[in-house]
């Protein structure tokens, strides 16, 4: 009984050693919201791949992807999911966080001129300056509208976003002073 238990434990550890990196790698590759062009409507759509299923399929040696969510659902839920070809071709390129990192990485804050080092998906988030002068966190923008919003808005750092939001929400508490420069 003990020898059988030891052999079983060794086999289990070996299987985990081989499969765990494959499963974790597939899960990390396919998690997160992505922007794709819907083949049916030719418009931007925000989709999420079923990352758990992708990880399980990777463990079994397959690469079959399925959508878990789409901004076009429930109206177009019966679609053929042809947009998955875009994700398979470039899984990182269509990730919302990749799109945002590249966009912010090429710019400086519209209000203070500070360069952006990295965007955060939690904590002190970067923001956007609307043409009307209001700032909003990028996380408040619906993913499928992100491309259009990035074309019309300017980047704002967390510090300027907080200061601007306070100034807009409580103008009676703010004294405008002329710049010393």
Question: Language model features by range: what are they?
Answer:
Residues 14-43:
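Transmembrane-cytosolic junction motif
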Residues 37-78:
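Acidic, Ser/Thr-rich low-complexity segments on the non-lumenal side of membrane proteins
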Residues 1-9:
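Feature marks short, highly hydrophobic, charge-poor N-terminal signal-anchor/signal peptide-like helices
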Residues 42-45, 74-77, 83, 87, ...:
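Cys/His-rich microdomains that often coordinate metals
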Residues 38, 67-70, 109-112, 154-160:
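Short cysteine-rich clusters marking metal-coordination/redox-active sites
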Residues 31-34, 66, 102-106, 150-153:
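Short metal-coordination and nucleic-acid-contact micro-motifs, chiefly zinc-binding Cys/His arrays
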Residues 138-181:
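Long, non-transmembrane cytosolic or organellar matrix-exposed soluble domains/tails
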């Amino acid at each position: 009984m003990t020898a059988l238990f030891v052999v079983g434990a060794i086999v289990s550890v070996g299987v985990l050693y081989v499969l765990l990196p494959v499963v974790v790698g597939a899960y990390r590759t396919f998690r997160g919201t992505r922007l794709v062009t819907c083949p049916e409507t030719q418009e931007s759509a925000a989709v999420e791949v079923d990352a758990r299923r992708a990880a399980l399929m990777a463990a079994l040696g397959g690469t079959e992807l399925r959508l878990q969510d789409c901004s076009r659902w429930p109206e177009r839920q019966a679609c053929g999911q042809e947009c998955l070809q875009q994700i398979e071709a470039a899984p990182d390129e269509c990730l919302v966080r990749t799109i945002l990192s590249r966009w912010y990485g090429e710019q400086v804050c519209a209000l203070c001129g500070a360069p952006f080092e990295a965007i955060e998906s939690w904590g002190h988030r970067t923001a956007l300056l609307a043409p009307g002068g209001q700032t909003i966190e990028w996380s408040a923008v619906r993913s499928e509208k992100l491309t259009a919003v990035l074309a019309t808005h300017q980047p704002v750092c967390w510090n300027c976003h907080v200061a601007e939001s306070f100034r807009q929400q409580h103008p009676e508490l703010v004294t405008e002073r002329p710049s010393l420069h």
